[in-house]
Amino acid sequence: MKKKLRRVVLLVLLVYVLSGIGATHLVYSFQFHRVPSQTCSAWPLYADVAQAYPRREVQFDSGENQLTGWVYGENGDALIIQAHGLGATAETYLPQTMWFVAQGYCVLTYDATGTGASEGKNTRGLSQSAVDLDAALDFAAQDAALCKLPVLLFGHSWGGYAAAAVLEDHREVRAAVSLSGYDTPFKLMCEQAEGYCGPVCYLFAPFALLHERVLFGAAADRSASEAIRSSGVPVLVVHGNADTTIRADGAALIAQTLSPNAQTLLLKGETHTSLLRPHTQEYADYTDKVNADYAALYDAYDGEIPQNVRAEFYAGVDKTVTGGVWQALMQDIDVFYRTALH
C-alpha cells in the first residue's frame, strides 16, 4: 500500500514538473518571439524623416548577439539612451527621439536582442531589456564622441524597467525616466499569468523563476526600486492609472515604496501607451478616422489584407499628425533632465 501511494505521489510530482516545464516553454515561445523591423506604420518610420534627422549607425555586443543602434543629434549637450518596450523597436519611439533632438539632446537608440536590426533568435525574457541597456551604456562609455557627454536614460515598459534596474551598476547616469515600467520580472510574470488563468498560475511560478535564472543568472533578480534606492540617481517614474498591461497598483514600479530620489507621476485615465501619444483634439479626431478606415479595409478583405494594400493604406496616413508626442509630459521630462544636469 505504501509503495503504491509512493508511486502515485511520484507520478503526480512528475506530471507537475513536466507540465510546469512545458507550460513555461510554451509561454516563453509565445511571449518572447522575435520582433521584425517595421515596414509600414501609422506612425513615422525613419525613411519618412531621414533628411531632417541624420543619424550614425553603430553596433555593440550584448552577450552572444550584436545589437544595432543609431546616434541622433551628435552635437547635443547631453546623451539620452532610449530603451524600447517589448514587441516594439527603436523606431516605434521615433517621435520621442525627434523631440529630444529638437531640444538639443544627443540620442542613442537601439533594437534590443531579438528585435528589428539586431541579432537574436528571440527576445529571451523580461530581464533582457536591462542586460541590453547595460551593453548600450558600456558602448557609450567607450565611444569617442558619446563618452564626453553626461548620460540620461529614457525607457518605456520593458525599457522602463531597464532604465531603473541598471542604475545600481551605472552610477555615471545623471537621471533616468521610467514610463509604464515594472519593478521585477517575477512580479510582472505572476500578475500577467494570474490575469490569464487565476491563482492556479502560482503553481507554475517556480518554473518561470527558474527559467529566468537559468537564462539570466543574477540579473533575473534585479529590482528596479532597489536599484533606484541604492544608486541615489534622480528618477522620474510615470504611469497611467488605467494601464491594463502593467497595473499601477500591482507589479508596476510606481506601486512600490520608492526612495526620496524618485519622483512619481500617476496620471489619471492614461493607459500603457497613451503616455507616448499627442493629447490634442486633432490627434484624437484623426486617429479615430484612421482606425475606422482601417476597420473597413479589414472587413473588406475578411481580415487578410494584402501587404501591398496595407502599405498603401499607411502611406496615406498623415504622419505629421500621428507622429507627435504628448507635449506637456515631454516638457516635464525635459525640465526633470535639465534640473538633474545643473
Residue ranges and their predicted role:
Residues V8-D61, T68-W70, N291-V317:
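An N-terminal hydrophobic leader/cap segment in hydrolases
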Residues T280-H342:
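Catalytic active-site module of serine/aspartate enzymes centered on a nucleophile-bearing elbow/loop
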Residues V233, R247-T257:
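Short alpha-helix in the alpha/beta-hydrolase fold that links the catalytic acid
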